[in-house]
Each structure stands twice: as C-alpha cells, then as structure tokens.
Amino acid sequence: MEKLKITGNGPLKGDITVSGAKNAALPILCASLLTADTLRLTNVPQLRDVMTTQKLLQGMGARVMTDNVHEFELSAAQVSDTCAPYELVKTMRASILVLGPTLARFGEASVSLPGGCAIGSRPVDQHIKGLAAMGADIVIEHGYVKARGRLKGARVVMDMVTVTGTENLLMAATLADGTTVLENAAREPEVTDLAVCLNKMGARISGLGTDRLVIEGVERLHGAEHAVMPDRIEAGTFLVAGAMTQGKLVLRNARAADMGAILDKLAEAGAVIEAGDDWIALDMPQRPRAVSLRTLPYPAFPTDMQAQFMAMNCIAEGVGSIKETIFENRFMHVPELIRMGARIDVEGNLATTHGVNKLSGATVMATDLRASASLVLAGLVADGTTIVDRIYHLDRGYEHIERKLGAVGAQIERTGG
C-alpha cells in the first residue's frame, strides 16, 4: 500500500499550479448523460474519483475519449444501461450524480446507494424528495434507488443545503416539462460552474450563485465546450501549507473570488495575501496565530478546509476553536495529530487546539480525504520523519500532491505500492 514519507524541511517557496476542481468536474462529467452530442471538457483533474466516474459512464455505454489527461470528450449517444452498479458506486459517493440526468433523459435510472468517505451519513433523501416532487416514481430496494417517469417542473424546497442534491435536481430539471424552482439551493461555486456548463449546452437556468435557482426545461440539450473551474480546496490546502511553514507561495490558476472565507482566516492568522484574477500570493513572515472558525455552507467557511486549519492551529500561537456543523464524525484526524504532539480537546462537534512550538514526526493513518491532507501539512512542520499511510484517500482529491509540494521545497516522497 502506498504511503507518503515527509521530513520537515523549512519554508515552502515558489509557484504551484492549481488543478481543476474535483467537486466541479464530477457533476459536469455526469452532465454528459443529458445529451447525445459531444461534451468537451478541459482542466479536468487527474484523480481517482474522476477515473471512477469515467468507468461508471463507460459502463453505462458512454464513450469517453481522453488524448490529454486533463481534456475529455464525452458522448452519451450510445448509452444502453441506466444502472449504476454497487461495485463502482461503493467507492465514491458522487456516483449518485448520475441519477438525475439519467432519469431526465431516459425516463428511468437505477443507482446503488453510495459509499465514499467515512465522515457521516450524508443521506440522499433530498435528491429523492426533489425527484419525487418532479413526478418520478421512486423505490429503494436491494440497496438501489430505482426511479421512473417523465419529469415535470416543480417547486422544490430543500430541507437542508446539499451540494450534490442541488446538482442532481438541477441536471434533472433541465429536461423536465415546464419550470422548476429550487429553493434553499447550495450556492457553492462548483454548483455555479455546473450551471454555467449546462447553460452552454442549451439549458435555461437563472439565479446562478444564489439560493434560488429557476430552470426552464427544454426539449433537448446539445454539445458544448467547458473549462472546469480551479479547485479552491486544493488552493486553500497549499496556502495553509505556506502559512504553516512560514513560506512564500504564488498559486497559479487560482480564483480568489471563490475563496473569501479561507483567505480571510489566513489573513487573521497573520498571512499577507495578494491576488489577481487567476493567481493568489501568500507571504507568512512569522508563526501563525490561532484562529477560531465554524464550518457552514458557502459563502461561509468550508467543511473541506476544516482539517487543514486544525493542523495549522496545532502549531499556531494561542488557542483556537473549530466547530464542525456540516458533517458528524469529521474529527477523525484528531487522534493522529495528537500522536504527533498536538494538544486538542474535542467535545461533540467542537475542537479546541492549544498551539505547541513543535510537532514530532510519526507514522499516522489517513481516514478520509481532507483528514489525510491535514496529516501531510503536519508532517511538513514536524521534527523528524512522518509516514502517512492509506493515501488512496488523498489521491481521490489531490493531483500529484507530492510533486507539487516537492517543487516548492518540501521533502516528500511516495513509497510502497
């Protein structure tokens, strides 16, 4: 099993190019099911979850061409199987995103209930409720969500903010008869990126970036070209790495406009931030100051950056508190950080860190995608060598993280396999 070996090596300095956003790429890949024409995508990250989605679409009969690892051509003209099997869905929760587009175009879909990260239940009830409101007949049997019917426009009020739920219903509504209104929709930039791509394909979606999306159904969608947005979570992770090592980094292909809450907290920690349309620069001249934060839906602080900021708080000056309000069971990195010398108290969904001068290298185990990133960051500033095990979690969301960090001065290598 592959591992990362990291030895603390001082400040990170240099340029890093940010990859395309995984959480935008996955729904956009699934959107190819909405048309028989070709969808051309660029800036697609080379990640395990992307490859899983590719296999899922190909298993359904779609043609996926990729001459360049970051460019895809997808055609769903020959889709013959409207079932997403457990064998693929169990490894990636985002597989549920084929449900809406498949049902909308073919009138039926069968999708295994998902697996993925072990960070809470993340139920799909909002997806099912919304599709049922649009006229679908839905049953859950033998571990599968089975849906049939011609979709009709409806007003759907989501009980909670759900990114994948919003995306599934958004895609389904593009081909429904009549107008659909999604209330309490997720406002995440990745949802907006999907909507932009769908509009290029001929969809009629308004309200982009707000919590009220209005979709006028059309008879058919056509092909389009779209560049996947930059990954704001990858960008945030590298910026935290720069801050923790008291380094100086410039991120290319990064959009500061999508990262307000993250950049505000880095500035609060003492970082000097500059940004342009497609770049962000960070200079951290001193030890970070501890910050307190609460995870909430966009535009507030993202749950996917919680673990990384906790790693920074572990070596920061002062006491910081982190309240996780999105997912239960998302402090699984805490015992591993404590093994490295961190002082963290957890009570329910609140973690309080007391900054220490130094962490010490240890063998630690990744439990989910963002937890594994926090352990890598901790390893960058620890005395001695840190071994991060189970990095297949990391490969689900970070493209060649060891190469990118190594290019700016980190002593990090992949071993085993």
From Swiss-Prot:
Residues spanning the signal sequence: none
GO terms for MF: UDP-N-acetylglucosamine 1-carboxyvinyltransferase activity
Keyword Transferase included in the entry's annotation: yes
GO biological process, one term: cell wall organization
UniProt keyword list: Cell cycle, Cell division, Cell shape, Cell wall biogenesis/degradation, Cytoplasm, Peptidoglycan synthesis, Pyruvate, Transferase
Entry EC no(s): 2.5.1.7
Coiled-coil zones: none
Active site: C117 (proton donor)
Functional pathway: Cell wall biogenesis; peptidoglycan biosynthesis
Family indicated by similarity: Belongs to the EPSP synthase family. MurA subfamily.
Name recorded for this polypeptide: UDP-N-acetylglucosamine 1-carboxyvinyltransferase
Organism: Laribacter hongkongensis (strain HLHK9)
Taxonomic placement: Bacteria, Pseudomonadati, Pseudomonadota, Betaproteobacteria, Neisseriales
Gene (name only): murA
